[in-house]
Amino acid sequence: MKFIILILSICSVLVGQGTRYIDEVFEEVIKTEDVIYGNAPDLPFWFWVESNTVDIDLDMDIYEPADDTALVRPVIIFLHTGAFFSGHNELDDVVDLAISAAKRGYSAISMNYRLGLNVLSTYSAERAVFRAVQDGSAVIRYLREYSELYN
């Protein structure tokens, strides 16, 4: 009987703590801007040949809840829209999603990825997706390497 009361007491405490990650429990968010997570060859905006590249720094913005005592938080990575042709990580919808996730207790990442799509090329769309996946993998590698710095 004592064991059942102990289990029920623990469950009632856990149920009361369950709103983190669901409801916005933090008022303020800390934003770390323009964190460089890599460097890669990029295509100019208007291109006809995919061998014409320029190296660029790849950056992201990190949103974290202010005054959070958790040492480890789950991470959500947001990518902007734009069909691999346009966009950046400071578009209003991506920023709003990242702030909302950080207020719920997550670490939220809004990342830039390499753009470039030649509608006249049959392989350009596949290569654009491949570059974005590579950039997403680079963000994950960076976050794993510097996890102690960014929680």
Region spans (language model):
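Short beta-strand element of the alpha/beta-hydrolase
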Residues: 71-83
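Bacterial Sec-dependent N-terminal signal peptides
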Residues: 1-20
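Alpha/beta-hydrolase active-site loop signature
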Residues: 83, 115-117
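Short, solvent-exposed loop/turn and secondary-structure capping segments
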Residues: 47, 72-73, 86-91, 120-122
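Alpha/beta-hydrolase active-site loop
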Residues: 126-149
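N-terminal cap/lid segment of alpha/beta-hydrolase-fold proteins
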Residues: 17-71
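Short amphipathic alpha-helix adjacent to the substrate-entry channel of hydrolases
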Residues: 90-110
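Serine-hydrolase catalytic-loop signature spanning alpha/beta hydrolases and amidase-signature enzymes
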Residues: 83-86, 108, 142
